[in-house]
Amino acid sequence: MKSFIEVAKPVVDSGIYMCAKFDQASCEALAQVQKLLGVENPVSAEKLHTTIVYSRKTVDLFPASGISEPARLVDVEKWDTKYGNTIVGVLESDYLHSRFNDAMDAGATYDFDNYKPHVTLAYDSRIEDISGVKRLLTLPVDLTIIKEDAESLDLDKTVEDITEHIEHRGESS
């Protein structure tokens, strides 16, 4: 069997981005969390994900499919990122830690001190104090990971590439 690198055959090593995707029920539960928090610029259901690998070096790790792995949303935090006030749901998941460790063992790079599994709920949210709205949530929220996707690392994604503004969601409320 060919390795991932043999299949992808990168000429210039742009790195690799791999993420875990959730089932429909999990995406609906996360959309409810977004709604309860009242976030602006929510990540759309089809773009909700958890980053596993964000490596400046391509590694030999195939994305998994046909899986059913549990994860739990256990907290919500505000992070200051290049996209503004980013609202993330902090996850507990042995599976995500295991896959991250697989990537690191395969030679992946990582720009942060620790791997903290999370799902981004909104970019440029304009929420300054998350503690006030966080109390509206009932945690934990059970989620199910059903597959992984991988692509070349793109360091120039815009907020429009990764979100869907609420006025485009088709919600009547």
Curated annotation (Swiss-Prot):
Tagged with keyword Cell division: no
Binding site for 3',3'-cUAMP: 17, 151
Lipid metabolism is among the record's keywords: no
GO terms, molecular function: hydrolase activity
Residues given in the record as 3',3'-cGAMP binding sites: 17, 151
Catalytic activity: 3',3'-cUAMP + H2O = U[3'-5']pAp[3'] + H(+); 3',3',3'-c-tri-AMP + H2O = A[3'-5']pA[3'-5']pAp[3'] + H(+); 3',3',3'-cAAG + H2O = G[3'-5']pA[3'-5']pAp[3'] + H(+); 3',3',3'-cAAG + H2O = A[3'-5']pG[3'-5']pAp[3'] + H(+)
Keywords: Host-virus interaction, Hydrolase, Inhibition of host innate immune response by virus, Viral immunoevasion
One biological process term in Gene Ontology: symbiont-mediated suppression of host innate immune response
Superkingdom, natural source: Viruses
Disulfide-bonded cysteines: none
Active site (record annotation): 49, 51, 118, 120
Family: Belongs to the anti-CBASS protein Acb1 family.
Function description: Counteracts the host CBASS antiviral defense system. Phosphodiesterase that enables metal-independent hydrolysis of the host cyclic di- and trinucleotide CBASS signals such as 3'3'-cGAMP, 3'3'cUA, and 3'3'3'-cAAA. Does not cleave cGG or cA4. Besides evasion of the CBASS system, might also enable evasion of the type III CRISPR systems that use cA3 signals.
Listed name of the protein: Anti-CBASS protein Acb1
Gene name linked to the record: 57B
